[in-house]
């Protein structure tokens, strides 16, 4: 039986429906907003696993090309492996929901939201969060939800709830806010140097709409929700738990405060190993081993948190608002176009910049249509960065961290008109002990400045943490990996000296209040300004010149009606020019022409040729041409592809010329001056006037 609930999301009508589609799933919801629709399902495995200390949750968002009536591109007409955008939306759904599942449920949970219709006006990521939460809420899977999300944009001096794609492009800030009735559980967004107060205003705007969307889900649950499965606490108990606790706790409390990540881990492992040897026979049982590991995790959690709340003592000895020592260096690699190393404590990022032509940009085949990105940032996290062995390659984490750093730096990247290059930044994480994505923002800024990219302002990032027992709390600046793992919040903020450009927050408690977030933002600003001051001591402005190994690029405009003349039949003209000058020539529909190549003179010569080809010949100007044919009365010279003129024998020299071939040869490149255009449009050229420099115009030989 079909059950429906209607409401609004921002100014747009919203439909939630269940009981008709995907009925064999534990829970399924069809959500529609205008012409965009999401089908979200959730299933759990039948078999329960004992002793898990995490939630085995997988979210696989996917978007179908049929949603917009589009055929998939490429040879295979079927959706393939998840695109980066699908992975990012999957993470966006996972993060606010994961803390609300019961760890002791012990079953694999699979959430599959699918975009099955899109009007290409309304973004479907926040709709997928609502649909996924609704599916879990009315399922039989235990869940401390519902969760809802809205996007808030700041546009023309006011906040807009769930803006359209065009409104997002014009906004100075856009942020996705997810939460429950109790408060906010996730924040992610980007901005163009906005203040902390403006961001907090967006969070306040979001909360009322989140509550309304949670109410819609509860109403649907009241109509067709299933009875929740009972969470049965694990019957397995660690044998000798109290004795193990007594043996390990005091030694672990000392080991956790060894200086240095490696030293701490070694000291803690030694304690664990010594205690395990005393219970070796018992720990051969897999369940007992998992319970033993869980107890040590519980003790580390307790020690770290109590020392921070009771004594303000962090494991590396810092004050709660202190930043680790910072070291910056640029120009660390000889050949790349720009490079820098940023080290903060035991976190280190090597960022390398490559400059390319505009045609080198990344093309994305989204369901809304193709788009080109001319600022690219790739984040790599090899296992050696944490002293481990493991699989090399790009996972969801790398894509997510790279997206955050990309968003944080995008606000300061120059427009193509100012800097007509594709810019690629690669961050290699060489060491990691917390906040590697924010280290990427810092190293990325340094490498861009070293490469000569005229960014608007330097950007720095910092990760904030939270420890709370429900009454007391401590906000930590520049958190370590252990503080992230054992803490209650990871709040990353990036920006310039004048405002925020990127942010991301995840919490492990049910919600975080707006007042606490305000305090965290203010503390983050102080830390960010400190980091920027250190970075500015190394490099504070773009290098005057780009690398001699970078391609040379000229960008200019031609008349739109001349684009066809430049391209030529079947691309013949532009290909001929590219081959002749050994450059790459690209043309946009608005008449923007970009010429790129390794040699500056070749790029300049090609530009001159394009300008000459696409403008009407002017009497009095000097052109560089090629002798095409020699006849008795002179030579025909091609001044640009398809345009020839006659250089009469009398215009070859001041003295008498008996044979034209005594002066010129076919294929010879010469400069000629256009001295006349007759009534039939024929061009009359002069070699001697060009040699004597009587041009009054452009000398293309320079």
UniProtKB/Swiss-Prot annotation:
It is found in: Cytoplasm. Disulfide bonds: none annotated. SMART domains: KH, S1. Residues 620-688 form the S1 motif domain. Its EC number is 2.7.7.8. It catalyses: RNA(n+1) + phosphate = RNA(n) + a ribonucleoside 5'-diphosphate. It is an enzyme of class 2 (transferase). Belongs to the polyribonucleotide nucleotidyltransferase family. This is Polyribonucleotide nucleotidyltransferase. It comes from Treponema pallidum (strain Nichols). The gene is pnp.
């Amino acid at each position: 039986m079909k059950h429906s609930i209607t409401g609004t999301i921002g100014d747009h009508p919203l439909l939630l429906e269940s009981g008709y589609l995907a009925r064999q799933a534990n829970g399924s919801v069809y959500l529609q907003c205008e012409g965009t629709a999401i089908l979200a399902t959730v299933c759990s495995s039948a078999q329960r696993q004992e002793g898990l200390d995490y939630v085995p949750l997988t979210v696989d968002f996917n978007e179908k090309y049929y949603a917009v009536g589009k055929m998939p591109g490429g040879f295979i007409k079927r959706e393939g492996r998840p695109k980066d955008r699908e992975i990012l939306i999957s993470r966006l759904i996972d993060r606010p929901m994961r803390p609300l599942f019961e760890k002791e449920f012990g079953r694999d949970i699979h959430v599959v939201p699918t975009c099955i219709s899109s009007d290409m006006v309304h973004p479907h990521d926040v709709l997928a969060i609502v649909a996924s939460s609704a599916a879990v809420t009315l399922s039989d899977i235990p869940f401390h939800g519902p969760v809802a999300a809205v996007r808030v944009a700041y546009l023309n001096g006011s906040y807009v709830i769930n803006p359209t794609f065009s409104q997002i492009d014009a906004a100075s800030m856009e942020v996705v806010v997810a939460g429950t009735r109790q408060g906010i559980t996730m924040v992610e967004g980007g901005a163009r140097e906005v203040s902390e107060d403006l961001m907090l205003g967006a969070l306040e705007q979001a909360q009322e709409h989140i509550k309304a969307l949670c109410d819609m889900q509860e109403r649907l649950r009241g109509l067709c929700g299933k009875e929740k499965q009972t969470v049965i606490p694990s019957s397995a108990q660690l044998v000798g738990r109290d004795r193990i606790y007594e043996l390990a706790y005091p030694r672990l409390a000392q080991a956790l405060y060894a200086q240095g990540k490696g030293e701490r881990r070694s000291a803690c492992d030694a304690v664990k190993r010594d205690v395990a040897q005393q219970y070796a026979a018992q720990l051969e049982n897999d369940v007992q081993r998992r319970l033993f590991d869980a107890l040590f995790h519980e003790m580390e959690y307790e020690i770290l948190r109590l020392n921070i709340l009771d004594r303000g003592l962090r494991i590396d000895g810092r004050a709660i608002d202190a930043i680790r020592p910072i070291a910056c260096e640029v120009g660390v690699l000889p050949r790349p176009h720009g490079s820098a190393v940023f080290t903060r404590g035991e976190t280190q990022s090597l960022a390398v910049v490559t400059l390319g032509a505009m045609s080198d940009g990344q093309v994305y085949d989204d369901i809304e249509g193709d788009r080109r990105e001319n600022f690219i940032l790739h984040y790599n996290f090899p296992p050696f960065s944490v002293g481990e062995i493991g699989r090399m390659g790009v996972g969801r984490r790398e894509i997510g961290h790279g997206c955050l750093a990309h968003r944080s730096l995008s606000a300061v990247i120059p427009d193509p008109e100012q800097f007509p290059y594709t810019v690629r930044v690669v961050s290699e994480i060489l060491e990691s002990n917390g906040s590697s994505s924010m280290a990427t923002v810092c190293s990325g800024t340094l490498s861009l400045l070293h490469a000569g990219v005229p960014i608007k302002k330097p950007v720095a990032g910092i990760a904030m943490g939270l420890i709370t027992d429900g009454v007391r709390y401590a906000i930590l600046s520049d958190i370590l990996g252990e503080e992230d793992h054992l803490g209650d919040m990871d709040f990353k903020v990036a920006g310039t000296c004048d405002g925020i450009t990127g942010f991301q927050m995840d919490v492990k408690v049910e919600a975080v209040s707006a007042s606490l977030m305000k305090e965290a933002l203010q503390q983050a600003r102080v830390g960010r300004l400190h980091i920027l001051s250190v970075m500015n001591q190394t490099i504070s402005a773009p290098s005057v010149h780009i690398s001699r190994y970078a391609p040379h690029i000229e960008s200019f405009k031609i008349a739109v009606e001349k684009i066809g003349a430049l391209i030529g039949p079947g691309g013949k003209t532009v290909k001929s020019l590219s081959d002749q000058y050994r450059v790459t020539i690209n043309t946009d529909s608005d008449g923007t022409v970009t010429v790129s190549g390794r040699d500056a003179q070749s790029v300049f010569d090609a530009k001159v040729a394009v300008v000459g080809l696409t403008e009407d010949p002017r009497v009095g100007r000097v052109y560089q041409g090629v002798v095409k044919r020699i006849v008795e009365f002179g030579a025909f010279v091609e001044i640009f592809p398809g345009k020839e003129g006659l250089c009469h024998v009398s215009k070859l020299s001041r003295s008498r010329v008996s044979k034209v071939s005594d002066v010129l040869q076919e294929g010879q490149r010469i400069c000629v001056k256009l001295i006349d255009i007759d009534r039939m449009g024929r061009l009359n050229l002069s070699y001697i006037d060009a040699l004597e420099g009587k041009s009054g115009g452009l000398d293309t030989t320079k």
